[in-house]
């Protein structure tokens, strides 16, 4: 056990306020499956996260269909930094800091819409849709030398900070770090598992039902880890009542069984992970109903998806109930087709942004089924959403204590059992009820926090 985690019963904890790389590396022991609880509750660690994780990772902002036309925008966040995602005249997408360069006021105060320009409501500095400063009130009178006629103020130098932007099959990501690897390299061997939802048809995907937002008083890593690695909670106690309530009335509840067949994937690099059931459609039926279940597992759409993704070797029609996280805060549920962004709000709170994604050429009836069932199950008041939120909130409450942060947490399930060479699924794969992907996520978190240079951190 690493020295930073090791705790002799009754001995004092060594609290760290200046987190050195060595101290950070001691917070996560992937070889023994141990986590220091302070990673969820320490303010100074969180401040480092904003710089070293959220300042260097590819972060999901939304879907291309959120900004279909020139001037369409979505105001969102990268970490705690407000940004604007805008469709350009050439149909590209730009992302820039939602901050006026004069006194720092937001230049866009609407959640979404269409604009020809963005004007700061404080002093009226105006920016075009590319983020270029185009108008400053009293520019000549206030900034120029009237006697010499020389104006040392150059508007071209005072646009908001621009982020790198890249898309993957409809999803829009951005990154502040010019040294970070490109998006496809960053996603790495997780891409086939993303494609199960994103690339089922040549028509691609479309976001429906708007963006739902709510706040949960918990650390962002609890949410990210659950979608990365934790089928365990769904197969034990957390969601059983909701699943049983969704079983069709004609079925005999005494015959209901917890799924036992499935797998989990850990990315070779990057902290990404996924899990899914195989040949266990009962959970999908209980959550999404018979129409969505049939659409995903049978018929022309399912056959097309399996053919289209045949190069992966994965039996995509047999994969149900999938969960996935692209580190750090992009999470989604293929088959349920719900996407989440966990915006951090300090070490003890997240703002959840969620939307539903469907095949663009799916029948209207199927799109409506997805929309309706996602509201019922995965909205702020959804059947399963309330279960998850309650668990995360209660954990975070406990971490206010001194002793609660002094005992290492167990992440040992399936330790050493995952391996490459699975006959159906690519990459490092193990049993569905495991924590290999969680260990990968926390190990990558530890590396990003302790390795400032991409020379050592890169894939």
From Swiss-Prot:
**What chemistry does it catalyse, as a reaction equation?**
biphenyl + NADH + O2 + H(+) = (2R,3S)-3-phenylcyclohexa-3,5-diene-1,2-diol + NAD(+)
Q: In which pathway does it act?
A: Xenobiotic degradation; biphenyl degradation; 2-hydroxy-2,4-pentadienoate and benzoate from biphenyl: step 1/4
Q: Where is the Rieske domain?
A: 58-156
Q: Which Pfam families match?
A: Rieske, Ring_hydroxyl_A
InterPro entries in the record: RHO_NdoB-like_C, Rieske_2Fe-2S, Rieske_2Fe-2S_sf, Ring-hydroxy_dOase_2Fe2S_BS, Ring_hydroxy_dOase_asu_C_dom, Rng_hydr_dOase-A
Which Gene Ontology BP terms does the record give? catabolic process
- Identify the domain of life: Bacteria
Give the protein family. Belongs to the bacterial ring-hydroxylating dioxygenase alpha subunit family.
Task: Tell me the protein's name.
Answer: Biphenyl dioxygenase subunit alpha
Species of the source = Paraburkholderia xenovorans (strain LB400)
Q: List the lineage, top down.
A: Bacteria, Pseudomonadati, Pseudomonadota, Betaproteobacteria, Burkholderiales
